[in-house]
Amino acid sequence: MRNIALRIEYDGADFVGSQWQTNGRSVQGVLEAAWQQLTGERRRMTLAGRTDAGVHARGQVANVRTDTRHTISTIVRGLNGILPEDVGVLAAWEAPDDFHARYSAVRREYRYVIDNGRTPSPLLRRHAAYVPRRLDTAAMDAVVRQVIGTHDFAPLSDGPQEGSTVRICYEARCTRTEVWGQPLVLIDIAANAFLRHMVRNLVGTLIQVGEGRIDADRFAAVLAGDDRRARVLAPAHGLYLMAVRYPEDGTGAADEPAAPHGVTETRMQL
């Protein structure tokens, strides 16, 4: 039996989330339906990251065990011919038998996109959170670096957690850019794994720093669990799962070396 890995991107606006659910349309559900139509097999796919309703992905990874004899290129072309317009397979590859999209991952990377223009862009309304007040990105960048390292991120999580709430954050930064003349603020964070709502709570609190509502000390108090009142959950539609990385690839499933059998095109980089 083969173990096929897929690199996927999707617009999360019209999904109830990435994981299969009984109450609505999920990314996993449409992927499994497309797989069955292509191969005739009913298979359960494993996704690397669980994304909430409205959250998007540029580098989600899934794996599926299969008896199909389709080539990798046929799998990519076939799935993309079946999948709806808001989901696409960017690449596929033969994975080792013990590869597991979720448990084999060693690093996940998220990006949060904020529309920081004087008026919100209609083109970004489902793909960036709008904040009208000009954000102090220098202050945000200085403060967000507090999360780098090994910490208990329970104060930034919601709901019950499985196992330890300690995570290793490898990178955190805040930058400013433009798309079509519209000012954007980008918050990038990478860690070995994330808790439920961890990134959105971090970003929502960080926005308050950028607005001048709280200072670095109060941000630190939120991280320590001493000031839950200052914690704010940012909207889902500004969040993107950008990449999932594995020890055997050295570069990550969202990088171009994995793309010979996938889709190659010029894209706007948010």
From Swiss-Prot:
- Region annotation (Disordered) maps to 251-270
Q: What is its EC number?
A: 5.4.99.12
Assembly and oligomerization:
Homodimer.
Keyword Calcium assigned: no
Protein name per its UniProtKB record:
tRNA pseudouridine synthase A
**Positions annotated as active site in the UniProt record:** 52
* Similarity remark: Belongs to the tRNA pseudouridine synthase TruA family.
Query: Which InterPro entries does the record cross-reference, listed alphabetically?
Result: PsdUridine_synth_cat_dom_sf, PsdUridine_synth_TruA, PsdUridine_synth_TruA_a/b_dom, PsdUridine_synth_TruA_C, TruA/RsuA/RluB/E/F_N
Classification via SUPFAM superfamilies = Pseudouridine synthase
Q: Which GO biological process categories is it annotated with?
A: tRNA pseudouridine synthesis
Against Pfam families, the record matches this protein to:
PseudoU_synth_1
Give the EC class as a word: isomerase
Arranged from A to Z, the UniProt key words for this protein are: Isomerase, tRNA processing
Q: Which reaction does it catalyse?
A: uridine(38/39/40) in tRNA = pseudouridine(38/39/40) in tRNA
Query: Which terms in the Gene Ontology molecular function aspect does this entry carry?
Result: RNA binding; tRNA pseudouridine(38-40) synthase activity
**Keyword Glycosyltransferase on this protein?**
no
Its job: Formation of pseudouridine at positions 38, 39 and 40 in the anticodon stem and loop of transfer RNAs.
- In this chain, substrate is annotated as bound at 110
